[in-house]
Structure formats: C-alpha cells, structure tokens
Amino acid sequence: MTNEQKCNIGVIGLGVMGASLAKNMINHGFCTALYSVSDQERKRFKSGKNNYRIFGSIKEFISSLERPRKVFLMITAGKPVDMVIASLLPLLDRGDIIMDGGNSFYKDTAVRCSECAKHGILYMGIGISGGEKGALYGPSIMAGGSPQAWERVRAILEAIAARHQGKACCGYIAEGGAGHYVKMVHNGIEYAVLELIAETYQYMRFVKKMGAGEIRSVFEQWNEGPLN
C-alpha cells in the first residue's frame, strides 16, 4: 500500500496476541497500521499481504489512520494501558475510538470509558478469547463500552471473529466495563474446567491406578458426549 493511503484501523502492540490479531485484520482485507515501541517486534512482524504499514512513531501511526480513527490496544493490562491512553489523547480528535483488547480489570475499563468521554474519545473494552490461534484465525469477541463506537467498528470485529453455524462469535454486551467483565467470567469458568480435568486425571491415575491408555479412552468418550 502507498504512504498516502489511509489505514482502516491501527493496532498498538505486536506481541504474540497483537501480531496475530493484526494479521487476522490484514488477511480480511483491512488496511492496518501497526505500532510497537519494540524495534524487535516491528522487525519480526511479517505478513504475506501488503495492506499494512509499520511505524516506530506514535504520531505517524495516528496520522496514517482514516477518520474516525480506530486504535486497537493489544498490550499488557494495568498501568501500560493508562500510559498509552495518555500518549494518545493529545493526538486524537473527538469521535475517535480507542479499543482495549487486553485482559484489563473491568472496573478499570469503566473508569477509562468515563475519562476518555471527557475528551470526546469513544472507548471500548473488548474481551478476546481463543489465544494466539484464535486471534489469527478467528477469536470470540466480547465488546463493551461506547455503543457509538461499537456501531463504527462492528463490521471489522465481526469480520475477524470466529464463526459458529454461519454467525460471528462477536457481540456487544453493554456500556462501561461489560466486555471485560464477561471475559473475566469466561476465564474463571475456563480455569475451573481445566482444574476439574486435572483433578479427574489425578483421581484416575493415582487412586484408581488406571494406565495412560485407559485414561485416554475415558477422556475420548467424554469428548463425544455432553461434556465436550
């Protein structure tokens, strides 16, 4: 793509999840601007498509985006998010959109929604589920925050999301930190299930003295039933 062409969306953070999500957007035909403070991350990023631009300057990154600007944060939760938001606010205009795709605490997201609104910036907290593979090929997306922002980014998010029976695994939950709240509940359920699987294995292996093949057969049977 040419330097004059404006990008549809920008991604900040090119770690495992950020790079995978960016490639997902690129593969779906969205012109994507990429920014990372890490020179190593910028050099490591590769895509078979040419509809993206990588920046080491946050100002140039923002200038490359079409209006209203759509900025997707894929960075570590907590203070780094607040630091990046602080660096973005002077560069953005009213109606521009910031989306946080990390695992931020939902109450922090609600505060950020309110603070950004004071500057006329639309803020969203977005739960992303599916890990590296999901981010690349289609994650489950739990969106919360500004309903106005949702209407402007919905087409992009639904396009990159996983699909089940023809429908995008992507939805708007509610305002504030609702998206990150649902992701938190999702994670709690997931980790509880993983713990149950581990304890079940331990019971079969060390109490029932079952061999690896027997245990595998049990789990395979469960995979074919309602426990799948």
Where are these regions (language model features)?
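Structural motif
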Residues: 12, 35, 55-57, 74, ...
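The beta1-alpha1 cofactor-binding region of Rossmann-like NAD(H)/NADP(H)-dependent oxidoreductases
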Residues: 39, 58, 78, 106-108
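Beta-strand segments within the central parallel beta-sheet cores of soluble alpha/beta enzyme folds
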Residues: 13, 214-221
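Short, conserved loop/helix-junction motifs that constitute active-site signature segments
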Residues: 90-94
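NAD(P)+-binding Rossmann beta1-loop-alpha1 motif at the extreme N-terminus of oxidoreductases
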Residues: 1-69, 95, 132-135
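Glycine/threonine-rich flexible loop motifs
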Residues: 70-87
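Rossmann-fold dinucleotide-binding core
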Residues: 81-84, 99, 105-216, 225-227
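N-terminal small/polar loop signature for handling phosphorylated ligands or for N-terminal nucleophile
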Residues: 63, 87-88
